């Protein structure tokens, strides 16, 4: 079973979301997602300042196996991207919940968080796959 940190929220598309002290949210892909994709070779990051809606594809993770869209779990403005992934995309594999984050978003509608999964619900989703 993949590591599923209890303090995070999750999407059904295998993104995770963590609220930061400044009110923004950090987004990445789950350990389960990176295991399915395999070794990352490139991450196409979104543009800082871009406005996205929940469910929009806003980044791409390219691995030795496939390219997979990364979706915005909530609507808002992209306020930062993980530039370290340009030189070290493998951080998505080795540190999916820490150094391998993809982007930070300032949510425009926090009620959308209610549609995300908690760790227990995400673990149940993984068991059903």
Swiss-Prot record:
SUPFAM superfamilies assigned to the protein according to its UniProt record, in alphabetical order: Single hybrid motif
Gene Ontology, cellular component aspect: cytosol; glycine cleavage complex
Names of the cofactor(s): (R)-lipoate
Domain Lipoyl-binding as annotated: residue spans: 24-106
Keywords, comma-separated and alphabetical: Lipoyl
Keyword Transcription regulation found: no
Xref: InterPro entries: 2-oxoA_DH_lipoyl-BS (IPR003016), Biotin_lipoyl (IPR000089), GCV_H (IPR002930), GCV_H/Fam206 (IPR033753), GCV_H_sub (IPR017453), Single_hybrid_motif (IPR011053)
Cofactor note as given: Binds 1 lipoyl cofactor covalently.
PTM sites of type N6-lipoyllysine: 65
Signal sequence coordinates: none
GO process terms (BP): glycine decarboxylation via glycine cleavage system
UniProt function note: The glycine cleavage system catalyzes the degradation of glycine. The H protein shuttles the methylamine group of glycine from the P protein to the T protein.
PANTHER family (UniProt xref): GLYCINE CLEAVAGE SYSTEM H PROTEIN (PTHR11715), GLYCINE CLEAVAGE SYSTEM H PROTEIN-RELATED (PTHR11715:SF3)
Subunit structure: The glycine cleavage system is composed of four proteins: P, T, L and H.
HAMAP family with a match to the protein in the record: GcvH
Family indicated by similarity: Belongs to the GcvH family.
Protein name: Glycine cleavage system H protein
């Amino acid at each position: 079973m993949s590591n599923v940190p209890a303090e995070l929220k999750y999407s059904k598309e295998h993104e995770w979301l963590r609220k930061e002290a400044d009110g923004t949210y950090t987004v990445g892909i789950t350990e389960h997602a990176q295991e399915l994709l395999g070794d990352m070779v490139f991450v196409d990051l979104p543009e800082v300042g871009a406005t996205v809606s929940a469910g929009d594809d806003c980044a791409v993770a390219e691995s030795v196996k496939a390219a997979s869209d990364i979706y915005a779990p909530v609507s808002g403005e992209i306020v930062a991207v993980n530039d370290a992934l340009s030189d070290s995309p493998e951080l998505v594999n080795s540190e999916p919940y820490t150094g391998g984050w993809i982007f930070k978003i300032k949510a425009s509608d926090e009620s959308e968080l209610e549609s995300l999964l908690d760790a227990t619900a995400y673990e149940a989703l993984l068991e059903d796959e």
